[in-house]
From Swiss-Prot:
Gene name in the database record: flaB3
Name of the protein this chain belongs to: Flagellar filament 30.7 kDa core protein
Sorted UniProt keywords: Bacterial flagellum, Glycoprotein, Periplasm
Cell compartments where the protein resides: Periplasmic flagellum; Periplasm
Post-translational modification: Glycosylated. Glycosylation is not essential for motility.
């Protein structure tokens, strides 16, 4: 029997340190709810889960971008609804003026309303804005010379974007006024013949507006479908990231209980090992 080196005590002390570290790790995982709290816990798992987290954040922002896009489209469509109503009213007045029972003076009075409505079409086009940007003056037309585009980033990665094109919806672009801005240059209802020609012009204008509204509806449907897909992708990534990173509480509690018992046993065995040297004393008496 030796007394200078108590190997049993040293072994018990080393195991006590190991078990105590295990308990501390269990407590950290149980209190944080995460299996990986630092790179040392699982280096590869941390790298993969961090990539997933960045992707999830990107998808969540893409969802917001899509919501902004839908709001932009709905605002534009609302202005075009007003334009459609005005064009419908002008067409109604043109049909009225084409009727032979009205005098030239009557048609002049009708023309006054038509001219005011044409001015309103221009007012809507110039005042239709979203976040300070004009929407109906051709800034975002496919053939725009301004060089501006309306682009929405609808994904979490590079080049995952979609463009929205909005044509010019001014009175001149719709054929309601001439190149000099004279409301009577192209749309006059001063006679039954000119009123009849105005009906054809208005039909063409309504076709342009309705096509633009249909395009906006298609854009919105696409965005809404993209939002659903992004939502599903985000959910799946969060589920996968949870499997990698989150704590399995039931399993961790079992491990925590085991390590607590081992720690208590190590403390007891360390106490026993420290008393072994006292067995030498009877030999010396």
């Amino acid at each position: 029997m030796i007394i200078n080196h108590n190997m049993s005590s040293m072994y018990a002390n080393r195991m006590l340190g190991i078990n105590n570290d295990q308990v501390q790790g269990n407590i950290e995982k149980l209190s944080s709810g995460q299996r990986i709290n630092r790179a040392g816990d699982d280096a590869s798992g941390l790298a993969v889960s961090e990539k997933m987290r960045m992707q999830i954040r990107g998808l969540n922002q893409a969802q917001k971008n899509i919501q902004n896009g839908v709001s932009f489209i709905q605002a534009t469509e609302g202005y075009l609804q007003e334009t459609t109503d005005i064009l419908g009213r002008i067409r109604e007045l043109s049909i009225q003026s084409a009727n032979g029972i009205y005098s030239d003076e009557d048609r002049m009075q009708i023309q006054v309303e038509v001219s005011q409505l044409i001015d309103e079409v221009d007012r809507i086009a110039s005042s239709a804005q979203f976040n300070g940007m004009n929407m109906l003056t051709g800034a975002f037309a496919a053939n725009s010379v301004s060089g501006r585009i309306m682009q929405f980033h609808i994904g979490a990665n590079v080049d995952q974007n979609a463009r929205v094109y909005i044509g010019t919806m001014t009175a001149q672009s719709l054929g309601l006024v001439g190149t000099q801005g004279d409301a009577f240059a192209k749309l006059s209802i001063a006679s039954p013949e000119s009123a009849n020609m105005a009906i054809a012009t208005l039909d063409s204008a309504l076709t342009s507006v309705n096509k633009q509204r249909a395009d906006l509806g298609a854009y919105q449907n696409r965005f809404e479908m993209a939002a659903k897909g992004i939502g599903i992708a985000s959910e799946n990534l969060q589920a996968a990231e949870s499997i990698i990173r989150d704590t399995d509480m039931a399993s961790e509690i079992v491990d925590y209980t085991k390590n607590q018992i081992l720690t208590q046993s190590s403390v007891a065995m360390l106490a026993q090992a420290n008393t072994q040297a006292q067995n030498v004393l009877p030999l010396l008496s």
